């Protein structure tokens, strides 16, 4: 029988983050995942400032991720065709990046191994039950496992929820549905810039192109399930989107798919979902921890993983009620507030006028562009004004993540510092900031 202080089920960002934090605090941690890494994961591959800061704190180095691409500017097109450039801050460090999950998650799991986590990838958990002051698991190819706590990072349809009998909404399908396809020979504006298109028929959803090294890009779109758009029509809608001139011109005439399109559901309901079942804490997609407005979830996954670890550390092995209380309070008190604000803003973006007004206001001048892009990329929490306990001194003007790594190279260009080509410079004319398409 395998014994541990904590067993983590799931090797994605939330599970690995929890495992790393626990191992560094001296806990004996085992991690199981049914997949063998590296493995692909359907995702937009974008990394917000908040996610980058957490990855840095947990020990992930960008140069360990082969497909890492620093982003220095974002372009947003409103339903009216107004396109605004939002340059990311030049205060040092990285504020946004793109990395394929097949590379990112494998590299992060290596960080967990280096921290002392015993990783069993390719081994599925087949049963789970709480027994007195332990949680008992049965794992394929490993056998029985017992731990004081379990961190469930096993995805939106968490099998552990079902095994423990705490499925709180049968038939749940998520708030978002997204489709992603990798493109190669991207030689247009999308080769270096990150693009978001708020086309009227997608609202409050959007289409995107996120740059990757070597003339490649993650291109896709996401829709809200509540918007009355049937998900079975997404592949046909995708073919139509790719023919739209304002998207085709950004990708470049030679851009072509290098892999099939893949679709996936996205959960975004952390404020109301069940976060704890006895000695089991749910994190990441299993906690439905995704931004309600954008569908982004990597930063939220890392945050829930760390919060779960800190709760276990603070509560100790014999006070599961305190662990549960601390974890729920921290999640609901911070991320719950972000979720409620994002849901409110999403209602504004459902309508063409609302989306058009949002882009107009955000791009009004240098000050609005500078502060909007920080907020958009989660340099600080969505609802930070309503949660003073999350304020920090340099919140509105501090540097990005990985500043020390950039300094060590002796260059101020983020992409070049990490071995990637720098983003193409934009002309210093009004058209570089705003242009109709």
Which residues does each PLM region occupy?
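Beta1/beta-strand and adjacent pyrophosphate-binding region of the FAD-binding site
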Residues: 1-14
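Conserved Rossmann-like nucleotide-cofactor binding loop
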Residues: 14, 37, 157
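Glycine-rich FAD pyrophosphate-binding loop
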Residues: 23-43
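Conserved N-terminal glycine-rich FAD pyrophosphate-binding loop of Rossmann-like flavoproteins
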Residues: 36-56
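A conserved beta-strand/loop capping segment in the N-terminal third of enzymes
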Residues: 52-106
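FAD/FMN-dependent oxidoreductases across multiple families
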Residues: 67, 227-312
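Predominantly flavin-linked oxidoreductase catalytic cores and closely associated redox partners
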Residues: 111-251
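C-terminal helical "tail/cap" subdomain of flavin- and related membrane-associated enzymes
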Residues: 310-437
């Amino acid at each position: 029988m395998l014994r541990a202080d904590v067993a983590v089920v799931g090797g994605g960002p939330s599970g690995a983050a929890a495992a790393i934090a626990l191992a560094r605090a001296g806990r004996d941690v085992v991690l199981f995942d049914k997949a063998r890494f590296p493995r692909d994961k359907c995702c937009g591959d974008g990394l917000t400032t908040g996610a980058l800061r957490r990855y840095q704190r947990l020990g992930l180095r960008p140069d360990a991720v082969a497909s890492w691409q620093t982003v220095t500017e974002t372009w947003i097109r409103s339903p009216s065709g107004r396109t605004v450039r939002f340059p990311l801050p030049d205060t040092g460090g990285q504020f946004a990046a793109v990395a394929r999950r097949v590379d990112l998650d494998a590299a992060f799991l290596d960080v967990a191994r280096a921290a002392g986590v015993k990783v069993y990838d390719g081994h599925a958990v087949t049963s789970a039950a709480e027994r007195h002051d332990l949680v008992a698991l049965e794992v394929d190819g490993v056998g029985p496992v017992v731990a004081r706590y379990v961190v469930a990072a096993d995805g939106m349809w968490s099998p552990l929820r079902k095994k423990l009998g705490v499925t709180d909404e049968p038939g749940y399908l998520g708030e978002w549905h997204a489709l992603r396809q990798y493109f190669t020979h991207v030689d247009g504006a999308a080769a270096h810039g990150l693009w978001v298109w708020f086309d009227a028929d997608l609202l409050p959803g959007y289409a995107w192109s996120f740059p990757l090294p070597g003339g490649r890009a993650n291109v896709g779109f996401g829709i809200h399930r509540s918007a009355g758009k049937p998900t079975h029509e997404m592949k046909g809608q995708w073919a139509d989107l790719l023919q739209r001139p304002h998207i085709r011109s950004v990708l470049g005439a030679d851009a072509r798919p290098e892999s099939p399109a893949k679709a996936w559901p996205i959960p975004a309901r952390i404020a109301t979902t069940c976060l704890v079942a006895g000695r089991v804490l749910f994190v990441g997609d299993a906690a439905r921890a995704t931004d309600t407005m954008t569908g982004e979830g990597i930063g939220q996954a890392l945050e829930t993983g760390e919060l779960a670890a800190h709760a276990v550390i603070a509560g100790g092995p014999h006070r599961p009620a305190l662990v549960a209380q601390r974890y729920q309070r921290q999640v609901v008190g911070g991320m719950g507030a972000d979720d409620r604000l994002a849901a409110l803003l999403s209602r504004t973006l459902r309508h063409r006028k609302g989306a058009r007004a949002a882009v107009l206001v955000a791009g009004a001048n240098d000050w609005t562009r500078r502060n909007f892009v920080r907020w958009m990329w989660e340099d600080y929490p969505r609802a930070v004004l309503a949660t003073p306990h999350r304020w920090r001194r340099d919140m509105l003007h501090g540097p990005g993540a990985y500043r020390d790594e950039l300094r060590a190279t002796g260059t101020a260009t983020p992409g070049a510092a990490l071995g990637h080509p720098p983003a193409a410079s934009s002309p210093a004319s009004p058209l570089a900031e705003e242009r109709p398409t």
